[in-house]
């Protein structure tokens, strides 16, 4: 084995799934996307491992044409994965210490970009892939439509399309049409007004565009246009702005004010900005993810069903434009992607275009209007025998002996005031008591939405015979938790930066302190799937809403009594428990919290659990002081 040169940073291993391959494409598409980003960033700082099943040939020569050129890739079996990675969905990145893992496509891709920039700080354009405020694909798929589109729906839809394609004209995946619809929507950027006024000025200088009084009519027909006009002129405002970002060049600041008729133009009269790339004007990580997926989709379409291209002209135009981005063609070539050229297929008449208004949106729900207070809803529940009811606290006076524990165990070590740290200790007293009374030697405990690790670190220290795993989507919070753990020398703790759904391991107890909105429901569902006990303290009731996974109310008992709108009214008022509110209002908020959590408890009971809704002690430890404790029967 060749000697590995020591570096200033800890060596990291990147693990990618491999199921099968076709010409120029490795499946699953998450792997193709990851390899394409590595090629685009010219990143060679990871030790790359392709993970295959026993049924797949491990002859690397068969894969060479579709892998990145000049990059060494090791082929291993799933049994050879480090234990922490065996508990996660791939792709995954793990440090050599084997106790810190990043899992899931969006998390791994963002990490690759960050590490590539750290390896070569001159490549500032790589950071631009993360978008405005560096938030591109940062939120989890459950709350971000772009993360869900890029990480889940588009790759899965195209994999199914490629698997099922035959000689018969196929049905275009609805996810493709949803993406086409998004490309037809007006662009929204942080400096929207400034750019639209610049565009208006440019249009007037070029003698194009309608008079200002007809600006609204222009906006109405925008969604029926393709990007044909955008492509026809390299001097268009959108392209100038987009490519200045790609080369990290700032346009010189102008000291001249805009003409009076431009400054005074109404916002409704300004021309809309047109999509240059997926999310709007700027080339981002979303484009990187979509490109390999859309390319392999178009290969089949052009080969067998070219007449279908009329159904997504904006997507075809985006595909052409993205090839002009610096380094994209080189990166694609290294990954075995041979771009298609579709110049004649972009000139599509208006009559041939599909009616995108009939395409369902990416979001499958809309928030109901909130009218009135919660009392009618609460009275309706009482008529059905459903009342506010808390189970007695098992030991309201029990506390962790914080004085004898190492300083790094206490939340006082975190960046918070002494009053807040005291309340955090009180919250932990409640959860730790329940968990320590349930846990047995050898149990695996998972701290979901762990944040800075306040719960998980205490449990790992107090239960050395148990394995504790912290799962958190925010990198900096998890890094702080690992630093505290390292100070304590804990050897029974894992750190996983991922959406909780990418944790696939078995466990015995799931814990979550103040998991926001539907995250509490995701934790409970995850525990029920593995028949694990759960101890959760919900938060952010106002963020609860129907999602692709959950519909509210959840339990059959509540469904028979309340509509979704009535349940949302309870959630809205459940958030009104802040200490500065009047006592009567806080009481109603506490009652609404209890009813929302009783619905969660009843739903878990329908799945074979014994569940209690308990009020934490003292109640002043937090405005959100409910605790839902469930044990499989």
Swiss-Prot record:
Keyword Cytoplasm: yes
Any one cellular-component term (Gene Ontology): cytoplasm
PROSITE patterns xref list: GST_CTER
Region (Disordered): 190-232
Keyword entries, A-Z: Cytoplasm, Phosphoprotein
Modification sites for Phosphoserine: 233
UniProt cross-references to InterPro entries, sorted A to Z: Glutathione-S-Trfase_C-like, Glutathione-S-Trfase_C_sf, Methyltranfer_dom, SAM-dependent_MTases_sf
Compartments reported by the entry: Cytoplasm
All copies of domain GST C-terminal, residue ranges: 130-332
Similarity section: Belongs to the GSTCD family.
Family matches, as PANTHER family: GLUTATHIONE S-TRANSFERASE C-TERMINAL DOMAIN-CONTAINING PROTEIN (PTHR13369:SF0), PTHR13369
Protein name (database record): Glutathione S-transferase C-terminal domain-containing protein
């Amino acid at each position: 084995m060749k000697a590995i040169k020591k570096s200033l940073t800890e060596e990291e291993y990147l693990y990618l799934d491999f199921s099968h391959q076709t010409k120029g494409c490795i499946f699953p598409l998450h792997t193709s996307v990851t390899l394409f980003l590595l090629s685009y960033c010219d990143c060679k700082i990871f030790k790359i491992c392709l993970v295959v099943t026993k049924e797949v040939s491990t002859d690397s020569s068969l894969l060479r044409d579709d892998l990145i050129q000049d990059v060494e890739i090791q082929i291993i079996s799933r049994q050879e994965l480090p234990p922490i990675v065996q508990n996660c969905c791939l792709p995954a990145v793990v440090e050599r210490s084997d106790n810190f893992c990043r899992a899931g496509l969006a998390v791994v891709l963002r990490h690759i970009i960050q590490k590539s920039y750290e390896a070569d700080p001159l490549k500032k354009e790589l950071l631009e892939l993360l978008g405005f405020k560096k938030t591109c694909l940062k939120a989890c798929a459950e709350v971000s439509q772009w993360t869900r589109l890029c990480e889940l729906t588009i790759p899965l839809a195209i994999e199914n399309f490629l698997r099922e394609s035959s000689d018969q004209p196929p049905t275009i995946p609805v996810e493709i049409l949803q993406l086409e619809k998004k490309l037809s929507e007006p662009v929204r950027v942080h400096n929207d007004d400034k750019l639209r006024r610049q565009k208006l000025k440019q249009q007037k200088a070029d003698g194009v565009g309608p008079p200002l009084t007809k600006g609204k009519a222009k906006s109405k027909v925008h969604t029926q246009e393709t990007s044909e006009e955008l492509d026809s002129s390299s001097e268009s405002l959108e392209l100038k702005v987009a490519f200045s970002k790609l080369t990290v060049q700032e346009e010189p600041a102008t000291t001249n004010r805009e003409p009076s008729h431009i400054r005074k133009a109404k916002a409704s009269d300004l021309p809309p900005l047109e999509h240059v790339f997926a999310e709007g004007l700027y080339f981002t990580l979303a484009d990187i993810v979509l490109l390999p997926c859309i390319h392999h989709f178009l290969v089949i379409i052009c080969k067998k069903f070219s007449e279908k291209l009329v159904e997504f002209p904006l997507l075809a135009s985006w595909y052409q434009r993205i090839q002009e981005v610096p380094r994209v063609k080189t990166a694609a070539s290294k990954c075995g992607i041979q771009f298609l050229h579709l110049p004649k297929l972009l000139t599509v008449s208006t009559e041939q275009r599909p009616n995108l208004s009939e395409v369902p949106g990416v979001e499958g729900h809309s928030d109901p209007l909130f009218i009135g207070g919660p009392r009618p809803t609460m009275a309706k529940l009482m008529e059905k025998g459903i009342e506010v009811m808390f189970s007695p606290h098992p030991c309201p006076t029990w506390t962790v002996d914080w004085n004898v524990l190492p300083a790094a165990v206490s939340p006082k070590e975190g960046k918070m005031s002494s009053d807040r740290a005291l309340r955090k200790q009180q919250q932990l007293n409640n959860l730790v008591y329940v968990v320590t009374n349930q846990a047995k030697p050898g149990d695996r405990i998972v701290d979901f939405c762990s944040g800075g690790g306040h719960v998980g670190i205490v449990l790992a220290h107090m239960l050395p015979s148990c394995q504790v795993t912290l799962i958190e989507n925010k990198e900096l919070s998890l890094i702080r938790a690992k630093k505290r753990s390292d100070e304590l020398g804990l050897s029974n703790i894992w750190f996983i930066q991922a959406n909780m759904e990418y944790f696939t391991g078995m466990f015995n107890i799931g814990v979550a302190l103040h998991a926001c909105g539907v995250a509490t429901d995701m934790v409970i569902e995850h525990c029920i799937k593995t028949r694990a006990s759960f101890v959760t303290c919900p938060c952010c009731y106002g963020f609860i809403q129907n999602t692709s996974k959950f519909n509210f109310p959840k339990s059959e008992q509540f469904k028979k009594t309340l509509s979704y709108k009535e349940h949302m009214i309870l959630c809205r008022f459940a958030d009104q428990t802040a200490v500065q509110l009047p006592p009567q209002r806080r009481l109603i908020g506490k009652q609404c919290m209890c009813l929302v959590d009783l619905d969660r408890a009843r739903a878990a009971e329908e799945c074979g659990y014994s569940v209690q809704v308990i009020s934490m002690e003292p109640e002043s430890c937090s405005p959100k002081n409910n605790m839902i404790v469930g044990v499989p029967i």
